[in-house]
Each structure stands twice: as C-alpha cells, then as structure tokens.
Regions:
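Compositionally biased, low-complexity intrinsically disordered regions
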Residues: 9, 16-18
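An active-site-proximal "capping" alpha-helix that borders the catalytic cofactor pocket
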Residues: 57-60, 102-118
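Divalent metal-dependent phosphate-bond-processing catalytic cores, especially two-metal-ion Mg2+/Mn2+ enzymes
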Residues: 2-7, 11, 23, 27, ...
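Short helix-capping and hinge/turn segments at secondary-structure transitions, especially at repeat
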Residues: 66, 88-96, 113-117, 121, ...
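His-Asp-centered metal-binding catalytic motifs of divalent-metal-dependent phosphohydrolases/nucleases
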Residues: 75-97, 108, 130-137, 154
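Active-site flanking loop/helix segments enriched in acidic
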Residues: 33-56, 88-99
Length: 192
C-alpha cells in the first residue's frame, strides 16, 4: 500500500484502476482452476494415484505455460485441460478393465462436458478442453501450444510413474517435445 501511495503521489503514470481490474480478473480465473481442482479431487473418490497424477500434470502444464509466456486465456484452458485430462480413467477401468489411452480418448468427451456444466467456463473453451482431452494420447496433428504443452506435461509425469527407459525418453525428446521449457525439464529430470 505504501508503494502504491508513493507512485500515485509522484505521477508514476500507472493507471491503478486498470491494474485493479486486471488483478481481479486473474484472481477470478485462478478460482475457476482451483474450483476445478477441488471438483476433480472429489470426482476421483479418494484414488490417490489418480489425484496425484493429475495434480502433477497440472503443475508441469502450469509451469511450462508460464515459462513459454502463454496469454492468460490459453493458460487457463491449458490448466483446466490438465486438471481433467484423465477424467475417463475410472470409467475405462470399470468398462474395459484398463485405462488404455485410446479408450480414454474415446470415452472422455461426454464426461468433460458434464464436469464443466456448473463451472463458469465458456462453451467454446469446454469444446476445446474436450477435444484436447480426446487427443492427449495422440502425438500427431498437434494444432496448438496448449496441445503441445499438455502432451509434454503428461509425458513428464508418466515417464516417472511408469519408469520409462532412457531410450524412450530420448525418442520423445527427438520426436515430440517442442517447447524450450518442456525440453529443459525432460533433460533435467530424465537425461542426466
């Protein structure tokens, strides 16, 4: 508060009214992601593996998105997608006996739509999130930075949880990873 008063009294040129609006918008968007996280934790009904997995993917996605300088809207869509990216795993385990990636992609769209129906997320964004979740095990046809970062964040977590070989990690580095931040993380974690 002291710094703000100093700047206001010394004609800093900063429009604090606009700054306050920007801060409130960011806080509102952060609450949407936080509410989605809480809802997803409840959705997984105590499955610590599923909960910890999505939280790790969300954390990597959030970090990579920020490091790559995503605009606020793309960052929010990315984070919400990371939260729900494995939403169909419980259904797939029950229906097919496993959570195969292609089956996850097939089963996820209606679950994503239902999940977001009572959260303040634009219909256009829900469609994008649903599409991304329905492709998060497909490494071709990447059509945006949100998709690219989701693939990288999920792989960073899966590589550790499933003890992928050094050769597998090296292959992904050469064929899938594109962002500078994702590449740095992959090398730092798995290729030392």
């Amino acid at each position: 508060m002291i710094i703000r008063e100093f700047l206001e009294n010394n004609d800093s040129g900063i429009d604090f009214e606009d700054t306050d609006i920007d801060i409130k918008e960011k806080e509102k968007k952060n609450m949407i992601v936080s509410n989605a996280i809480e809802k997803m934790i409840d959705f997984y009904q105590g499955s610590q593996h599923d909960i910890n997995h999505f939280l790790k993917v969300w954390s990597y996605a959030r970090n990579i998105g920020q490091m790559e300088g995503l605009d606020d809207h793309t960052q929010e869509v990315l984070e919400l997608t990371a939260v729900v990216h494995d939403i169909s795993c419980p259904l797939c385990r029950e229906k097919y006996g496993n959570a195969n990636g292609k089956k996850q992609e097939l089963e996820s769209p209606p679950l994503v739509s239902e999940f977001f129906k009572d959260l303040p997320v634009a219909e256009e964004d829900v469609k994008r999130i649903s599409w991304l979740v329905a492709h998060h095990h497909t490494y071709t046809g990447v059509d945006g930075i949100d998709y690219q970062i989701l693939l990288e964040a999920d792989y960073l977590v899966n590589a550790g949880e499933s003890s992928y070989s050094r050769e597998n990690v090296q292959h992904m580095l050469e064929t899938v990873f594109q962002t500078e931040s994702g590449i740095r993380l992959l090398k730092s974690i798995y290729l030392r």
